[in-house]
Amino acid sequence: MAKIRVYELAKELNISSKELITLLEEEFSVEVKNHMSAIEDEDANLIKELLSGKEKSEKTKEEDDEIETTAKNPIKESMNNKKSNKRDDKNEKVNTENAEDMGIITMTSDTITVKEISDKLEKSYAEVIKELMLMGVMASVNQEINFEMAEKLAAKFDMEILKEDEDEKEDLEDILKDNEEEEYLQKRSPIITVMGHVDHGKTSLLDAIRKSKVTSTEAGGITQHIGAYTVELNGEAITFLDTPGHAAFTAMRARGAQVTDIVILVVAADDGIMPQTQEAISHCKAANVPLIVAINKIDRPGANIDKVKQELTEYGLVAEDWGGDTICVPVSAHTKEGIDDLLEMILLSSEILELKANPNRKAKGTVVEAKLDKGRGPVATLLIQNGTLRVGDSIVVGSTYGRIRAMFNDKGRNIESAGPSTPVEILGLSEVPEAGDKFYQVKEEKTARGIADKRKEKIRDEYLQSTHKVSLEDLYNQIQEGTVKELGLIVKADVQGSVEALKQSLEKLSTEEVKVRVIHGGVGAINETDVTLATASNGIILGFNVRPDNNAIIASERDGVDIKTYRVIYDAIEDIKSAMLGMLEPEFKEVVIGTAEVRQVYKISSVGTIAGAYIQTGKLARNAGARVIRDGIVIFESELASLKRFKDDAKEVAQGYECGLSIEKFNDIKEGDIIECFIMEEIKKKTL
C-alpha cells in the first residue's frame, strides 16, 4: 500500500506539520515521530475529507458575510477587494513557498540574526523588526536574538522554529532512514571491488572485462588511485572499484571493502598467496563481504591452480570443488579465458545477496576519491549507495559541503541524475573532502554548511595542541632527551588516496619512545593554514607531489616549522624512520655573506700575494669560504687564509671598509678581481 509523508500531506492541506501531527495522534491515534514519517494513504484520505468538510463550511460562512457586507457598501468594498486580492495573491505565494519548507524553519546555533530569521520566514526586515518592537525588543538587522525570542517571533507568523541538536546534526543516518520498507526497495547493481597483490593482474582483469585499455596509461602498470567503472552485462549493470594493490595503500583497499558488495580476489596462478593477498582476505572477513577468487595468469607456464586452492585453505577459504563454499574461477586476463565464467558468478552471487535500494529517497553514499583540479576546483568521485542524486542538490560530506553544479559518469559524460550503485564525479563542493567520507543529501545548502562548520570546528579543536618545536634533523636528540613523546605530522598530497597511503604507512613507524601521529591530511598545495596548524601542534609538514606557496614559506621560516616535500612516497617514510633512529644527515646550503673588489696587489716572498680590497657588500670573515671571480667567471675557490685591517688581524671586516687579505693556496690575484666570501649553512631540507 502506498504511503505519504507527513510534510507532503501538510503541504496539500495548507497546514503546519505540527498541527497535522497533533491531529493524527488525537483524532486517528496514529503515532508519528516527525514531519518525515510516512502514513498510509487510507489515513491520509480520511484526514483530507475531514479537513475539506470543515474548510467548506467555514468558506460558505465567510462568503455569506462577504455578500452581506458588500451589499452595504458596494463601491468601497469593490476597491477593498482589489487591494485584498493583491494581498491574497502575495500571501498565497508566500504560503506556497512556506508549505514547501513544511512550515518549519531551523536554527543551527543558540542565536540567529534578524536578517537570517527574516529570510527564513520570508518576511521583510521591517515586518520582523516591527514585531520585535511590539514584543519589547529593539534589534537591528544584524543583531542576534536567542532561540526563545526566535520561537515567539516565528509563532507570530504562523511558523515553528526548531533547534537542531548535536545528535541530529552528527547522525544524519537517522534523518535519512525513512522509506526503507520492502515496498520502496528496488533491485540495484552490485558493487565489485577487485583486490590482490601487486602485479597479479587486477587492472588487466578489469581491462579485459571493460574491453578498454587502461593499464597502458598507468605508470609502471600500477593503478595510482581508486577508479570506479560501470559495465553492462546481459542488460544488467555492474560497478567495479579498482583499489591499488601495493602494501603501502592498505588504507585505500580497506576503504574499498567497506562500500563493496562482492570482492574479487585476484591471485596469480604462478605466485600464489602473497602479503597483500593476506591483507585483502583479512579486510573481507572483517567487513563480512562475500569473496570470489579469480585465479589469474593460468596461461603462464608455471601456473598451478591446485597449489593456489591449497594455500587458500590455510586462510579458511575452501574452494567449492573441494567441498567448501568459496567460488574459485580460473581466468586469464591476457587470453580472456574464464572471463565469462567470472561475470556469471558475479551475477549469481548478487542475485543470492538480493541487493536492493530505494531510488526515491534522498541520496547517500561514500567518497571514493577526491582531488583539487586547477580549472574546476574541488572534484570528488562519489559512489551512490542509496537514493538518487541530482544536479542542484545540496550535500554534506564530512566537514565540507556544497551544491552540485555538474555531475559526470565514469565515461566523462555530463548527466543530470544518478541512482544507487552509480559512481559519479561531481563539482561544486566548498573544499576537497576526505576519501572514505560519507555524503548525505540535505534540503538546503545552508543546512549543509551549518553541519559542515560544526564538524570542522570539532576537528580544529582536536588539532590545536601546543608543545616544543620539532624538526627531523634534531628529532633523535629530542627523543633521547624525552622532550618529544609524539611526532605530529601534517600530510599534503596531490590526491586524497596518497594522503591515506602516507598516513597508514607513517603511523606504523610508532615506537615505545615516540608515537607518530598524522594530525591532518589534505589535498592541494601547502599553505599558510597548514603552517599555523604545525606551529600550534608542534608538527612537521610532509608534501607529496605538492609544493608550499610563498605565504607558507614565509610563515614556516618565521615560525620555525619544518617542511619536507617528496615525489616518492617511500622516501618520506624512510626519512622519518631515519630521523627517529638519529641517522638523517642534515642538508647544507651556501650563503654569500659579502663581496670585495681587489684594488691593489702586493707580492711578498715569504708570505705570497696579498690583496688590498674594498668591501662592496655584506662583510668578509676569516676562515670563511672564498672564491675569486674575474670577468664574471670563477677562477679559484678556497678559503680566506688571512684578513687584516691595517696591520691588525681582523675576525671580520664590514661593508664600506678596506682590508688586506690572502687566499689559501692561490697567489694569482689581480686588480679588479672580485672576492666572494661565503659560508655553508645547515638548512631544513625543502625537497629531495
Curated annotation (Swiss-Prot):
It is found in: Cytoplasm. Coiled coil: none annotated. It holds the Pfam family EF-G_D2. Residues 332-334 are annotated as: G5. Residues 53-62, 86-95 have a biased composition (Basic and acidic residues). One of its GO terms (biological process) is tRNA methylation. GO terms for molecular function: GTP binding; GTPase activity; translation initiation factor activity. HAMAP family: IF_2_B. This is Translation initiation factor IF-2. It comes from Clostridium botulinum (strain Hall / ATCC 3502 / NCTC 13319 / Type A).
